[in-house]
Amino acid sequence: MRDREQARARRVVLWIYLVATVVAVLITWPLAAWHPIARTLAATLVATLVVFAGSRLFDNSSIYDPYWSVLPIALALWHEHDAPDDASGGRQALVLILVLLWGVRLTYNCLRGWTGLGHEDWRYREFRTSWGRWYWPGSLLGIHMFPTLLTWLGCF
């Protein structure tokens, strides 16, 4: 039964992240005139809002946890695709491979230890208790948006 619950939880997270990815890509089209870094910021923030909505829907902020390792992969792929024609192909390929290896390993480790939608990081449970009714606004800003901005900044 535990394996089934884990598999279901992983499918839920996968769907949330797929929707976040589609929404992030769609938001960049009307922003085509923006600088590529500004477009990735907008896409990243919108994707984070989708993941937050999934966290809220399933009452579990740990749904965000893989984002730390998935976002750099998405940004590396985006910048590889959006790179100028005169960019160093070898260097781009090396960076992409390294980010992919790192991100896949970290995502695997994150999901391996996650037992399902009933499991939430102990720190988030403590925040729930101490923040009370302010937990979800705090989760949006402190657990979702702030780490997203740090991760986005770390990709440059």
Placement of each model-derived feature along the sequence:
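Membrane-anchoring alpha-helices and their flanking helix-loop junctions
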Residues: 1-156
